Curated annotation (Swiss-Prot):
Family designation: Belongs to the polyribonucleotide nucleotidyltransferase family.
One GO location term (cellular component): cytosol
Signal peptide: none
Residue ranges of the region described as Disordered: 704-733
Residues reported to bind Mg(2+): 488, 494
Compositionally biased intervals (Basic and acidic residues): 708-733
Its EC number(s): 2.7.7.8
Keyword Chloroplast: no
S1 motif domain span: 624-692
GO biological process: mRNA catabolic process; RNA processing
Domain KH: 555-614
Provenance organism: Bartonella quintana (strain Toulouse)
Protein name, entry field: Polyribonucleotide nucleotidyltransferase
Length: 733
């Protein structure tokens, strides 16, 4: 019934299996991939024909994690998987980026790649396996895909690279790098690093590229026995149109690209494009061989050729800069004084307002993943409204691009954050892109660094980012620092590097062509370092380190630690005690399983009140210590006082005052607030307290020759204390 084909190899010490022919047989391509005991299913379906007037390649990659893969039922009301999580969106992009450039130029059939994690062993991360399975399914499908590609994860620990480290090895690694590519070229890199130097990062890329070569061989072997016949696809030949158009508009395009202002340049290009389309389309129907989409496509190709050749020939950029110059930078902090921290970062025509907000444990984000529920304490949200590029558009939940750019900036900042022990706040940074002409994600990195320092977050060091580009024709190439939007679209590489003066914290690379050598990447990294240092120096004109004090509008958090067996005493039955503390003091209190308690409030007195209350519950009173308490019961022989939390002790009638007392209620009544000294314990272990040697107004011990006289005065104070008078009156009512 099934005609299956299976390839198995040993890869990084674990078995990798690729199998096809048994599941999802109606898809154009389907592969079950197994690594260790993690299993994913990848399917590919591509429409037989493009939609009418389709002017782009509609590729969709959907990565989804099934909770049954780890034997769990999803949380929430519906109890089923729903919209993609942030992690699923990021992995979908991770797969999309290296495969998209390898489809044949001009192929516009609707194509969908769906990858499902159907078993997860909690050791082997499924993202790399999903990428490999997608590549294998595409290679088998018959669509014009010039692959295969493969990917690998690289760690760095004890000065050694690790290929595909286990999940439990990652906390010790100084590097989390994913690299993907073909047999001869690197196409994509995504990474987070602990301030590693450029040579270590480049070495990791090449180590990963070498490491996934056996996987490429396995996919090719599977394709040799299981691939479908290639689809008939002949790219459009528009060379005649290109020749004719070049003669007509070359000089006009060159002239338009001498305009340095983005909006003016875009307007000039749009006018020229409209004119050329109208000119070709104005011919009689029988003489016009080309559609408006074809004319627009060739016009875009001509733009790229002219701009690229001009940069290679003159070493000058669209805006007149040389290859390595960074656009003018202006940095400001504290622009929104009632927020916890804020910054405005402007680089040329790219601008970001970044606002930092500090929160408590209640503000941590709960994330439900295949590995279980965890809490995220650093949030970075990137918003790209349409007005930032002078356009109209929808507003709503963030798209894949916004999520991806935000995560890149998150990776750049994350390694430089203080530890939770030294700075126990939840941190949220929001980047509002107000202008964009290239590298808004790196503007977000710079703005976030400044905003966090303005908020008083003690970053290890400031972080900056820069986007690099590449123009390559044959053996000639030019590496561009701080690329414009047009240079990004028309170039061969988008290469983003973020880090500190000491090293790289994040690296993202997308390469559109083969032939990017190790030497080119090395030059690009060195040029990026120079640009990054320049940007850090410019940022330092606004702020060089975290402010000494938090904003007056920020919450204050103090941390205390208690014994684990005391947690239930602080919480109380059904949360009664902790609710009372919160209600009475106004503080926010978060208790962790290890006994760490975080107390938050904008008012220092509130925090101190909550701390005293908790100490009174968990600490043991000391003999000789003086404590404030409440009279809870009176008797002929004395008064029972509740002190130091839930503890009760007896003040014998002889210890109420130095005067002879015939009736306890002549001195105190139930509800009175009194100061007592712990004298010790009787033979039965009962607490013995004394009031007569404590000043009932100040709570200090009475000493010296005037103690008897003072005590007589304080006896009256105890009866006439305004608080006790109020409590008595309330009781009588």
């Amino acid at each position: 019934m099934f005609k299956t084909h299976k390839i198995e190899i040993e890869w990084a010490g674990r078995p990798l299996t690729l199998e096809t022919g048994k599941i999802a047989r109606q898809a154009d391509g389907a592969v079950i991939a197994t690594y260790g005991e993690t299993i994913v299913l990848a399917t590919v379906v591509s429409a037989k024909n493009p939609k009418p007037d389709q002017d782009f390649f509609p590729l969709t990659v959907n990565y989804q994690e099934k909770f049954y893969a780890v034997g769990r039922i999803p949380g929430g009301y519906l109890k089923r998987e729903s919209r993609p999580t942030e992690s699923e969106t990021l992995i979908s992009r991770l797969i999309d980026r290296p495969i998209r450039p390898l489809f044949a130029d001009g192929y516009k059939n609707d194509t969908q790649v769906i990858v499902s994690v159907i078993q997860y062993d909690l050791e082997n991360n499924p993202d790399i396996l999903a990428m490999i399975a997608s590549s294998a399914a595409l290679t088998l499908s018959g669509v014009p895909f010039m692959g295969p590609i493969a990917g690998a994860r690289v760690g760095y620990c004890n000065k050694q690279y690790i290929l595909n480290p286990h999940i439990d090895e990652m906390p010790e690694s100084k590097l989390d790098l994913v690299v993907a590519g073909t047999e001869s070229a690197v196409l994509m890199v995504e990474s987070e690093a602990q301030e590693l130097p450029e040579d270590i990062m480049l070495g990791a890329v090449m180590f990963g590229h070498k490491g996934f070569q056996p996987v490429l061989d396995a996919i090719i072997k599977l394709a040799e026995v299981a691939a479908k016949d290639p689809r008939d696809f002949i790219p459009e030949d528009l060379s005649d149109l290109e020749t004719a158009m070049l003669e007509m508009v070359e000089q006009d395009i060159r002239k338009a690209y001498t305009i340095t202002d983005k909006q003016e340049r875009s307007t000039a290009i749009d006018v020229l494009k409209t004119e050329i389309i109208n000119k070709f389309m104005s011919e009689t129907e029988e003489n016009c061989k080309f559609s408006a989409d074809q004319i627009a496509t060739v016009f875009k190709q001509l733009q790229a050729k002219i701009v690229r050749s001009n940069i290679l020939d003159t070493k000058k950029r669209i805006d007149g800069r040389d290859l390595s110059t960074v656009r003018p930078i202006q940095s400001e902090v504290g622009i929104l004084p009632r927020t916890h921290g804020s910054a405005l970062f402007t680089r040329g025509e790219t601008q970001a307002i970044v606002v930092a907000t500090l929160g408590t444990g209640e503000d941590e984000q709960y994330v439900d993943s295949l590995t279980g529920m965890y809490k995220e304490t650093f949030l970075l949200h990137y918003n790209f409204p349409p007005f930032s590029v002078g356009e109209t558009g929808r507003l709503g939940s963030p798209g894949r691009r916004e999520i991806g750019h935000g995560k890149l900036a998150w990776r750049a900042i994350h390694p430089m954050l203080p530890t939770k022990e030294s700075f126990p706040y939840t941190i949220r940074a929001v980047s509002e892109i107000t202008e964009s002409n290239g590298s808004s994600s790196m503007a977000t990195v710079c703005g976030t660094s400044l905003a966090l320092m303005d908020a008083g977050v003690p970053l290890v060091r400031p972080i900056a980012g820069i986007a690099m580009g590449l123009i390559k024709e044959g053996e000639r190439f030019a590496i561009l620092s701080d690329i414009l939007g047009d240079e990004d679209h028309l170039g061969d590489m988008d290469f983003k590097v973020a880090g500190t003066n000491n090293g790289i914290t994040a690296l993202q690379m997308d390469i559109k062509i083969d032939g990017i050598t190790e030497e080119i990447m090395k030059i690009a990294l060195e040029q990026a370092r120079d640009g990054r240092i320049h940007i850090l120096n410019e940022m330092a004109k606004a702020l060089t380190s975290a402010r000494d004090e938090l904003s007056e509008f920020s919450p204050r958090i103090e941390v205390m630690n208690i014994a684990v067996d005391k947690i239930r005493d602080v919480i109380g039955s059904g949360g009664k005690v902790i609710r009372e503390i919160v209600e009475q003091t106004g503080a926010k209190i978060n208790i962790e399983d290890n006994g760490t308690i975080k107390i938050a409030s904008a008012d220092a007195k509130t925090i101190e009140a909550a701390k005293r209350w908790i100490h009174s519950i968990v600490d043991e009173p000391e003999v000789g210590g003086i404590y404030q308490g409440t009279v809870v019961k009176t008797a002929e022989f004395g008064a029972f006082v509740n002190f130091f939390g839930s503890r009760d002790g007896l003040v014998h009638i002889s210890q109420l005052t130095t005067e002879r007392v015939t009736k306890t209620t002549n001195v105190v009544k139930e509800g009175d607030k009194v100061w007592v000294k712990l004298m010790g314990f009787d033979e039965r272990g009962k607490v013995r307290l004394s009031m007569k040697i404590v000043d009932q107004q100040t709570g200090k011990e009475i000493t010296g020759d005037n103690s008897i006289k003072a005590e007589k005065e304080k006896y009256a104070d105890t009866k006439n204390n305004p608080e006790n008078k109020r409590l008595r009156k309330k009781k009588e009512e």
